[in-house]
Amino acid sequence: MATFTKIKSMYFPRDVLIGHNAIHQVVDVCQSLRFGKKGIIITGQDTYKAAGREVEERMSKDYDLKTIFTGNATPENVKEVSEAVKSHEATFMLAIGGGSKIDISKIVAKDLDLPFVSVPTSVSHDGIASDRASLKSDTGAQSVEAVAPTGIIADTTVINEAPYRFLASGCADVISNLTALKDWEFASWMTDEEMSSSAFMISKYAAENIIENSDRIKPGLEESVWLIMRPIIASGVSMCIAGNSRPTSGSEHMFSHALDVIRPNTALHGEQCGIGAIMMMHLHRGDWKRIKDSLIAIGAPTTAAETGFTEDDIIDALVMAKDIRKERFTVLGDKGLTRTAAKNLARVTKVI
């Protein structure tokens, strides 16, 4: 009999607080996690106004804090924040903002072996609780290994103040899990790729939960934020279990990353993934109309025109998608789509 040698490490958020005025308990969360007394707040100008200043004021009596203002998650900004953290001799970090501030903190936390608390001010994607980060460069966005936050404080009051477009984008990103899971299942059949059933089911729960509540997710309703936060966090946790982004990222994300290369900074990540999921579910011969109807109910875009892309952008991205992550087997296969097939796919799903 062969000797069993398998071993795996998984890191999850330990303290998750969701709800109305949740940041009022930031000191309690940090004390319960026993971080030490020297902290760094990583934020941006707008997100500092949204939540950073209040966190700073609430913690200043008990902690030696330094606030760092930064921008997009680029290698340069990661290095700058890392140097500031080391200079302050910080024992923990607080990431206050949208995706970029949390992504920077994830990478720095991994590099320096430091705990951090994620305090999202908007939820335009499902990365709040995951151990992956999106690092931007001139050639587009790259998913890199990082570390999940030790704690999460999701203040529904704060998040509800952000533009509703961000919330709808986060929902679309989680809904797109359905095609990622189809791709993962397909790869396990075709290539014997290992598939985690627990990560699979958690990711599926997250997507189905948002679809089932799609008619209750509306602009200006704090309850809408409450409804989606658990699925968004669960989606991130599924990646922690799998040890990669497979439960939440497949052909629809490859399409999205191709759009980032073709026409960067045109639409939000989740918006692009939602549109990609409509088309990729059609390739899987699944219920793509259910995805589209759910996105429409939420208020997320389902067409090129709604997101600022041209018909050629969509077609070019569909053709390019197969080359984004060649090691990841999806419904696109090795050869991908011809331009004619891509055009037909986008038209039959009414993306163009």
Description of each model-found segment:
Residues 85-108, 112-123:
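A short, small-residue-rich loop immediately preceding and capping a beta-strand
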Residues 2-7, 11, 174, 285-352:
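C-terminal charged capping/lid subdomain of soluble metabolic enzymes
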